[in-house]
C-alpha cells in the first residue's frame, strides 16, 4: 500500500493538523484568504474532511495560502505526511503544485509588500502560539 493511499485512508478518521494550529490559523485566515467559515468547518477543511458549507478561496489569495500551507506542513510529522497533506490541501484549494513550488516563499522575499510581510508574521505567530499552548502543562 502506498503512502498516499494510506494517508487518504487514515485522514478520514484521524486529524493531521493539530487543533491549536487550526484555531490560530483560523483567526488569521477566516474571511480573509477563505470565505467565512465556522470554526468546526475550518478544522475539518484543514484536516481534509468534509465541511458543512463549501469552502471558497478568496480571489488573489493563492500566494498567501501557499505560505500558510508551507508553514503548517512543516508542523506535521513525519515529513512525508506533511508533504502529502500539502499536496492534498492545495488540490482542495485549486492551487497547482507547480504554482506552490514557485511561490510558497514569496511572502518572505525581500521585495514582499508590507501586507504580505504582516501576513507572514501573523501565520508565524499563530504557529508559535499553538506550539506554546501545546507545551503548557
Regions found by a protein language model. Name each.
Residues 1-137:
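Flexible coil/loop and intrinsically disordered linker positions at secondary-structure junctions
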Amino acid at each position: 500500500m502506498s503512502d498516499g493511499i494510506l494517508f487518504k485512508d487514515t485522514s478520514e478518521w484521524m486529524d493531521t493538523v493539530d487543533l491549536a494550529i487550526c484555531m490560530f490559523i483560523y483567526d488569521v485566515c477566516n474571511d480573509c484568504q477563505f470565505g467565512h467559515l465556522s470554526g468546526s468547518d475550518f478544522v475539518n477543511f484543514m484536516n481534509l474532511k468534509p465541511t458543512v458549507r463549501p469552502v471558497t478561496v478568496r480571489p488573489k489569495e493563492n500566494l498567501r495560502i501557499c505560505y500558510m500551507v508551507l508553514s503548517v506542513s512543516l508542523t506535521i510529522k513525519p515529513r512525508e505526511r506533511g508533504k502529502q497533506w500539502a499536496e492534498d490541501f492545495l488540490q482542495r484549494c485549486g492551487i497547482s503544485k507547480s504554482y506552490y513550488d514557485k511561490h510558497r516563499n514569496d511572502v518572505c522575499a525581500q521585495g514582499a509588500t508590507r501586507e504580505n510581510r504582516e501576513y507572514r508574521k501573523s501565520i508565524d505567530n499563530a504557529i508559535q502560539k499553538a506550539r506554546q499552548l501545546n507545551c503548557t502543562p
